[in-house]
Swiss-Prot record:
Alphabetical list of InterPro entries matching this protein: T_IF-3_C_sf, T_IF-3_N_sf, Translation_initiation_fac3_CS, Translation_initiation_fac_3, Translation_initiation_fac_3_C, Translation_initiation_fac_3_N
Alphabetical keyword list: Cytoplasm, Initiation factor, Protein biosynthesis
Protein's name according to its UniProt entry: Translation initiation factor IF-3
Assembly notes: Monomer.
PROSITE patterns found in the cross-reference section: IF3 (PS00938)
Organism, as annotated: Fusobacterium nucleatum subsp. nucleatum (strain ATCC 25586 / DSM 15643 / BCRC 10681 / CIP 101130 / JCM 8532 / KCTC 2640 / LMG 13131 / VPI 4355)
Length: 188
């Protein structure tokens, strides 16, 4: 049991520490005979052999990093690899932070819902739509109501008609479950 816990912790820390993949080749790990070299400042130094490029990078105190391995000849840049890796992880974290998660809120409605209860549910739907969340309005039918599903469908149609201006309405009337999905309209 102890070995397994340590084993899992090792992989957890390894996963946590390596945000970007280490597929970027540096220094001696770069394959090829000739490379197109870009200096630390961004100037093109031309095509050099692997040995010349490594000597130039080490004399300046930087690493030789392969940027475009599929180009002919491969493009390498002289730079500080640890700084490059840090910037890449920071860009990935910012991209994840700026992504918006799609949240779907669900409200259940019965076929025999009272008008005041329906108003309360619709107020909830408007609040969810203002927060730019999708809303799923599900029709719940009990017992013999399933035989008269058209009564519940009219309730869903009323809801769809009310929110047709403020939200995009997607109706799904399957055999057993009937629901609408309301997504907020994009403001241009």
């Amino acid at each position: 049991m102890y070995f397994r816990t340590g084993f899992c912790l090792f992989y957890f820390f390894q996963w946590r520490c390596s945000v970007i993949s280490d597929k970027t080749r540096i220094n001696e790990k770069i394959r090829g005979k000739e490379f197109r070299i870009i200096s630390f400042d961004g100037e093109q130094l031309g095509i050099m052999t692997a040995e010349q490029a490594l000597n130039l990078a080490s004399s300046q105190g930087y690493d030789l990093v392969e940027i475009a391995p599929s180009a002919t000849p491969p493009v390498c840049k002289i730079m500080d690899y640890s700084k490059y890796k840090y910037e890449q992880t920071r860009k990935l974290k910012e991209a994840k932070k700026n992504q918006k998660q799609v949240v779907i809120k669900e409200i259940k409605v019965t076929a025999r819902i009272d008008s005041h209860d329906l108003e309360t549910k619709l107020n909830q739907v408007t609040k969810f739509l203002e927060k730019e969340n999708k809303v799923k309005v599900t029709l719940v039918l009990f017992g013999r109501e399933k035989m008269h599903a058209n009564l519940g469908v009219t309730t869903l149609d009323e809801i769809a008609e009310k929110f047709s201006e403020t939200a995009e309405v997607e109706k799904k009337y399957a055999d057993k479950q009937k629901h609408l999905i309301l997504s907020p309209k994009k403001v241009k």
